[in-house]
Amino acid sequence: MKKTYLLNSEISEVVARLGHTDLLVIADSGLPIPDGVKRIDIALTKGIPSFKDTLNTVLTELGVEKAYIAKEMIDKNNDLYLYLLELFGEKLIIISHEDLKAMSKNARAIIRTGEYKPYANIILESGVEF
Protein backbone atom coordinates (compact mmCIF):
# COMPACT_ATOMS: atom_id res chain seq x y z
CA MET A 1 0.00 0.00 0.00
CA LYS A 2 1.19 3.51 -0.80
CA LYS A 3 2.84 5.28 2.14
CA THR A 4 2.70 8.91 1.03
CA TYR A 5 -0.09 11.33 1.83
CA LEU A 6 -1.77 11.43 -1.60
CA LEU A 7 -3.83 8.26 -1.94
CA ASN A 8 -5.98 8.99 -5.02
CA SER A 9 -4.44 6.86 -7.76
CA GLU A 10 -5.58 9.03 -10.68
CA ILE A 11 -4.20 12.21 -9.15
CA SER A 12 -1.00 10.46 -8.09
CA GLU A 13 -0.46 9.16 -11.62
CA VAL A 14 -1.02 12.58 -13.20
CA VAL A 15 1.38 14.27 -10.77
CA ALA A 16 4.01 11.60 -11.42
CA ARG A 17 3.74 12.16 -15.17
CA LEU A 18 4.01 15.97 -15.06
CA GLY A 19 7.10 17.47 -16.62
CA HIS A 20 8.56 20.92 -16.20
CA THR A 21 5.95 23.61 -17.05
CA ASP A 22 3.09 21.11 -17.46
CA LEU A 23 -0.21 22.40 -16.09
CA LEU A 24 -2.57 20.87 -13.53
CA VAL A 25 -5.86 22.54 -12.59
CA ILE A 26 -7.63 22.23 -9.27
CA ALA A 27 -11.17 23.47 -9.78
CA ASP A 28 -14.36 24.22 -7.94
CA SER A 29 -17.47 22.29 -8.88
CA GLY A 30 -18.49 24.77 -11.57
CA LEU A 31 -15.45 25.32 -13.77
CA PRO A 32 -16.09 24.07 -17.32
CA ILE A 33 -13.78 21.22 -18.29
CA PRO A 34 -12.72 21.44 -21.93
CA ASP A 35 -13.11 18.48 -24.24
CA GLY A 36 -9.90 16.51 -24.50
CA VAL A 37 -8.59 17.39 -21.03
CA LYS A 38 -8.49 14.57 -18.49
CA ARG A 39 -11.20 15.01 -15.86
CA ILE A 40 -10.54 13.71 -12.37
CA ASP A 41 -13.85 14.21 -10.63
CA ILE A 42 -13.52 13.81 -6.88
CA ALA A 43 -16.59 15.89 -5.96
CA LEU A 44 -18.84 14.03 -3.53
CA THR A 45 -21.27 16.69 -2.39
CA LYS A 46 -21.41 20.44 -1.83
CA GLY A 47 -18.08 21.42 -0.28
CA ILE A 48 -16.59 17.93 -0.10
CA PRO A 49 -13.76 17.67 -0.77
CA SER A 50 -12.83 21.30 -0.39
CA PHE A 51 -10.54 23.19 -2.71
CA LYS A 52 -8.04 23.83 0.10
CA ASP A 53 -7.89 20.20 1.22
CA THR A 54 -7.37 19.06 -2.34
CA LEU A 55 -4.72 21.68 -3.07
CA ASN A 56 -2.81 21.00 0.12
CA THR A 57 -2.81 17.27 -0.57
CA VAL A 58 -1.60 17.70 -4.15
CA LEU A 59 1.15 20.02 -2.96
CA THR A 60 2.60 17.22 -0.82
CA GLU A 61 3.79 15.64 -4.08
CA LEU A 62 3.98 18.45 -6.65
CA GLY A 63 6.67 21.07 -6.98
CA VAL A 64 5.11 24.28 -8.28
CA GLU A 65 6.95 26.89 -10.31
CA LYS A 66 3.96 29.19 -10.86
CA ALA A 67 0.33 29.26 -9.80
CA TYR A 68 -2.39 31.10 -11.73
CA ILE A 69 -5.68 32.35 -10.32
CA ALA A 70 -8.46 34.56 -11.66
CA LYS A 71 -8.42 38.20 -10.60
CA GLU A 72 -12.12 37.87 -9.81
CA MET A 73 -11.13 35.78 -6.78
CA ILE A 74 -9.72 38.90 -5.10
CA ASP A 75 -13.21 40.41 -4.70
CA LYS A 76 -15.46 37.34 -4.82
CA ASN A 77 -13.45 34.95 -2.62
CA ASN A 78 -10.96 37.16 -0.79
CA ASP A 79 -10.23 34.73 2.06
CA LEU A 80 -9.06 32.14 -0.44
CA TYR A 81 -7.06 34.75 -2.35
CA LEU A 82 -5.22 35.80 0.82
CA TYR A 83 -4.55 32.16 1.68
CA LEU A 84 -3.08 31.50 -1.77
CA LEU A 85 -1.05 34.70 -1.69
CA GLU A 86 0.53 33.59 1.57
CA LEU A 87 1.06 30.05 0.27
CA PHE A 88 2.62 30.94 -3.09
CA GLY A 89 3.93 34.49 -2.65
CA GLU A 90 5.63 35.73 -5.82
CA LYS A 91 4.76 32.50 -7.63
CA LEU A 92 1.09 33.54 -7.66
CA ILE A 93 0.07 35.11 -10.97
CA ILE A 94 -3.23 36.93 -11.41
CA ILE A 95 -5.06 36.57 -14.73
CA SER A 96 -8.65 37.02 -15.87
CA HIS A 97 -11.16 34.22 -15.38
CA GLU A 98 -11.52 34.00 -19.16
CA ASP A 99 -7.75 33.57 -19.53
CA LEU A 100 -7.78 30.92 -16.80
CA LYS A 101 -10.45 28.98 -18.67
CA ALA A 102 -8.47 29.31 -21.91
CA MET A 103 -5.26 28.12 -20.20
CA SER A 104 -7.08 25.13 -18.74
CA LYS A 105 -7.41 23.74 -22.28
CA ASN A 106 -3.66 23.04 -22.11
CA ALA A 107 -3.76 21.27 -18.75
CA ARG A 108 -2.74 17.64 -18.39
CA ALA A 109 -5.74 17.21 -16.09
CA ILE A 110 -8.41 19.09 -14.18
CA ILE A 111 -9.29 17.93 -10.69
CA ARG A 112 -12.92 18.82 -9.99
CA THR A 113 -13.56 19.25 -6.27
CA GLY A 114 -16.80 19.73 -4.40
CA GLU A 115 -15.91 23.36 -3.66
CA TYR A 116 -18.94 25.64 -3.81
CA LYS A 117 -17.30 29.05 -3.37
CA PRO A 118 -16.80 31.28 -6.42
CA TYR A 119 -13.57 31.38 -8.39
CA ALA A 120 -11.92 28.62 -6.34
CA ASN A 121 -9.75 27.53 -9.25
CA ILE A 122 -6.01 27.39 -9.67
CA ILE A 123 -3.64 26.35 -12.42
CA LEU A 124 -0.44 24.86 -11.08
CA GLU A 125 2.61 24.95 -13.32
CA SER A 126 4.93 22.09 -12.53
CA GLY A 127 8.42 23.01 -11.44
CA VAL A 128 11.70 21.16 -11.29
CA GLU A 129 12.87 19.74 -7.99
CA PHE A 130 16.60 19.81 -8.68
Curated annotation (Swiss-Prot):
PANTHER family linked: D-RIBOSE PYRANASE (PTHR37831:SF1)
GO annotation, cellular component aspect: cytosol
One of the GO BP terms on file: D-ribose catabolic process
Native source species: Thermoanaerobacter pseudethanolicus (strain ATCC 33223 / 39E)
Residues binding substrate: 28, 97, 119-121
Enzyme class: isomerase
Function: Catalyzes the interconversion of beta-pyran and beta-furan forms of D-ribose.
Protein name, UniProt field: D-ribose pyranase
Location in or out of the cell: Cytoplasm
An example Gene Ontology molecular-function term: D-ribose pyranase activity
Quaternary structure (record): Homodecamer.
